[in-house]
Swiss-Prot record:
EC number: 1.2.7.1
Annotated organism of origin: Methanothermobacter thermautotrophicus (strain ATCC 29096 / DSM 1053 / JCM 10044 / NBRC 100330 / Delta H) (Methanobacterium thermoautotrophicum)
Pfam family, one: POR
Enzyme class: oxidoreductase
InterPro entries: Oxidoreductase_gamma_subunit, PorC_KorC, Pyruvate_synthase_PorC, Pyrv/ketoisovalerate_OxRed_cat, Pyrv_flavodox_OxRed_cen
Keyword Oxidoreductase: yes
Catalytic function, reaction form: 2 oxidized [2Fe-2S]-[ferredoxin] + pyruvate + CoA = 2 reduced [2Fe-2S]-[ferredoxin] + acetyl-CoA + CO2 + H(+)
Higher taxonomy: Archaea, Methanobacteriati, Methanobacteriota, Methanomada group, Methanobacteria
The name this protein goes by in its record: Pyruvate synthase subunit PorC
UniProt gene name: porC
GO molecular function: pyruvate synthase activity
PANTHER family: PYRUVATE SYNTHASE SUBUNIT PORC
Assembly, per entry: Heterotetramer of one alpha, one beta, one delta and one gamma chain.
Keywords noted in UniProt: Oxidoreductase
């Protein structure tokens, strides 16, 4: 079973990202589950959401403590929350940050999701950008399934722009992979 933990701030779309990822995995023929972790959070407060993906039914109903992957929508959370907590030894982090990040022993992939979101959406809402990057880094879901679910989640022009943002992030990761 693959377990993913999302870190974001209230209003950034971490919960929606976890749900879209689960639906894209289902679209690809996997079993999946997504759920949020809420306390008394308000807009701007740190939030977590989780996705599990497997080839067999997912029966666990508790938060993810030892993720295979961590997706961080807001770089500032690295200084506020231990986003690396419980990450498996071979775990991978996808971080919204322009430039490199020194994660010590942790494998961190960075992408300027905020820049892509501003360019495509005109707003710094990065959840779909980060999903495109995640798909590119991990290959756990196909970009086609991801884009299909994004368009179903956000109909019309908003969906088209979010799909474009996800594809841009995916292609940026692919370029980095080719140039490695």
């Amino acid at each position: 079973m693959i377990e993913i933990r999302f870190h974001g701030r209230g209003g950034q779309g971490a919960v929606t990202a976890a749900e879209i990822l689960a639906k894209a995995a289902f679209e690809d023929g996997k079993y999946s589950q997504a759920f949020p972790f809420f306390g008394v959070e308000r807009r701007g407060a740190p939030v977590m959401a989780f996705t599990r993906i497997d080839d067999s039914p997912v029966r666990r109903r508790y938060q993810v403590y030892n993720p295979d992957y961590v997706v961080v929508l807001d770089e500032g959370l690295v200084d506020v929350v231990d986003v690396f907590s419980g990450l498996k030894d071979d775990g991978v982090v996808v971080l919204n940050k322009s430039g490199d990040f020194q994660g010590g022993d942790v494998k961190v992939h960075t992408i300027d999701a905020t820049g892509i979101a501003l360019e495509t959406l005109g707003r710094p809402i990065v959840n779909t950008v980060m999903l495109g990057a995640f798909a590119g880094v991990t290959g756990l879901v196909s970009i086609d399934s991801l884009i299909k679910i994004i368009k179903e989640t956000f109909p019309g022009k908003i969906g088209e722009k979010n799909a474009e943002a996800a594809r841009m992030a995916y292609e940026e990761i692919e370029k980095l992979r080719v140039n490695m």
